[in-house]
Amino acid sequence: MSLTKNNISKMIKNISLNDAKNDLENLKNLKKKSINSDNYLIGLKYLDYFFFKYRLETRLKGYSFYDVFKNKELYNKLIKRGRKLNPYYNPIIQLYDAYRLYIGSNNQFRPSVARNIYLYFKPTSILDFSAGWGGRMLGALSIPDLKYTGYDTNKKLKKSYDKIITSNNTSDRIKIKFMDSSKEDFSKLKYDMVFTSPP
């Protein structure tokens, strides 16, 4: 098997569409004020199904995870450390774990946290001027009738966002605009909560 970006991402997180859908259903069933160590990760599998391979493209300290494969010195250094961290895992996971520990980790906003905040404050329309990997969007999507407008400049994410919105029949209330949000005239939008997390 060749090491394509898609293959690499699946070797680290091989999430089926069914697993992703189940994760979204669990998020939709999460009650207000019920987040704990057992369920605060709910929703991340769903997002990783769509966005994980793109998260691996993000450069931290000058290197994306994919860049490591092109840099023999860095690869050897990280794989050596990865083998010590997780000697029984496959080499790609060893490399990924070492990358996250020694280079950096590209995290997502927890959809469960976003959902809980929305349930607590009861907004009708969210404005998010830095949508990123979709955590706040998915929190909004999980609540019927809640509107969300997000902005992001990473056009590579458009196809995945479109799939999420279309497959959940939420195009009437969930919107993502791929543009620099500083160019938007927010006075033309209707929203009663601004909730964002810039990079």
Task: Describe every region a protein language model picked out.
Residues 1-41, 52-68, 73-199:
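Class I S-adenosyl-L-methionine-dependent methyltransferase catalytic core
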